[in-house]
């Protein structure tokens, strides 16, 4: 579409076109659900759409209101997110009243990063739920009258982190919003929202990013070298959040460890495989072990592609290893192993001991040798 500034959100032209049609109709719903994977531009699109709605003329988003929208400044934007619980906090306290000075400083820094880079994923320790007190504050925000902005917004990040009580409290705000008030509920897990919430929102779906778009955003918005961005984007599943998780690792080391663990487990060298995995469990970081499982699954999926004669692999520099694997383990039930590895990844979220999970990873991979070799 001509002059659609929403296309500045890379890789989301379909969502941008839908929102532009809504903008052109001037029939603006009071609530949107932006649904799609983490790290694909949902928050950025909400900000750009609100800028567009408040622009004095189409394509002109340089007004002072637009700047305040970009800065997530109240009373233009109410930004709601998960927060840690403070010491002795009760439902009568405000969302931040009982937080320590250190946590408040961390929150301030994280919000500043989000303002500077709308693709940034806020990471606040202990922030696991959206507090009902945060939802109740929306009523106060709605009661303000402010004529400088034609449209104001409530942006709820990771809306699925509201429990049922918080969602029911939100319903009251959704049912009778004042004129010019828009809600943006942003989540990768829309099915965790109550049907009564979903029925009041206009759903806009967001797609995983294409590799070239993801690489370009990594370069432009995160300052990643192009060569590194191109390599990372291949393994990122179309998500900047996943890409940044990979960037936090030594990526070449991660690939090397993945191959070594597979090689040792398949050779039944349990101690060597366990030693390699121990570097992912030593820090007691569930995220690192989850990442390793994802990399192993990616390699096994590449092996399945090779077996089917497909040529495009994520582990493209190891195509020879994939061929040797399929020659040796032609009867391997890769799908079953991948299914069990996914179960192990989910069990990490249930606080199962990481060392127990590490042993199970090795045993699942070793099972390929027992059942995958073609009999003579």
Question: Positions of the model-derived regions?
Answer:
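Conserved Walker B
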Residues: 158-162, 174, 190
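Clamp-loader machinery-focused feature within the broader ASCE/P-loop NTPase space
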Residues: 2-161, 165
